[in-house]
C-alpha cells in the first residue's frame, strides 16, 4: 500500500478508471455476442443488434478504451461474420 498521499489518490483514480473501462469492454462484448447470436439464428432484429454493436465499439473508441485500429478490426470482423451467414452458399 502506498504511503504518499498523492500516490494513494492516483491509485484510487486508476481503480475508478479501470472499473469504467471494464464496464465499457463488457458492454462491447455483450453487444457483439448478442449480434452474433441474432445473425446465426437469423433473427428479425439482427440489423438493429449489429448497429448497436457498432455503436458500442465506436463509443469505446471515442472514450479511449479501444485503439482506433482495434475498434475498426472488431467492426470488420463482425461485418465479415454477418456477411458469411447472410450470403448463400455456392
Swiss-Prot record:
One of its GO terms (molecular function) is structural constituent of ribosome. One of its GO terms (cellular component) is small ribosomal subunit. Transmembrane segments: none annotated. Pfam families: Ribosomal_S20p. InterPro entries: Ribosomal_bS20 (IPR002583), Ribosomal_bS20_sf (IPR036510). Binds directly to 16S ribosomal RNA. This is Small ribosomal subunit protein bS20.
Amino acid at each position: 500500500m502506498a504511503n504518499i498521499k498523492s500516490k494513494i489518490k492516483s491509485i484510487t483514480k486508476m481503480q475508478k478508471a479501470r472499473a469504467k473501462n471494464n464496464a465499457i469492454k463488457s458492454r462491447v462484448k455483450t453487444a457483439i455476442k448478442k449480434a452474433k447470436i441474432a445473425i446465426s439464428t437469423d433473427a428479425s432484429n439482427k440489423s438493429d443488434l449489429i448497429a448497436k454493436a457498432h455503436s458500442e465499439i465506436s463509443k469505446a473508441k471515442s472514450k479511449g478504451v479501444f485503439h482506433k485500429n482495434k475498434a475498426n478490426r472488431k467492426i470488420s470482423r463482425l461485418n465479415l461474420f454477418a456477411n458469411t451467414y447472410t450470403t448463400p452458399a455456392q
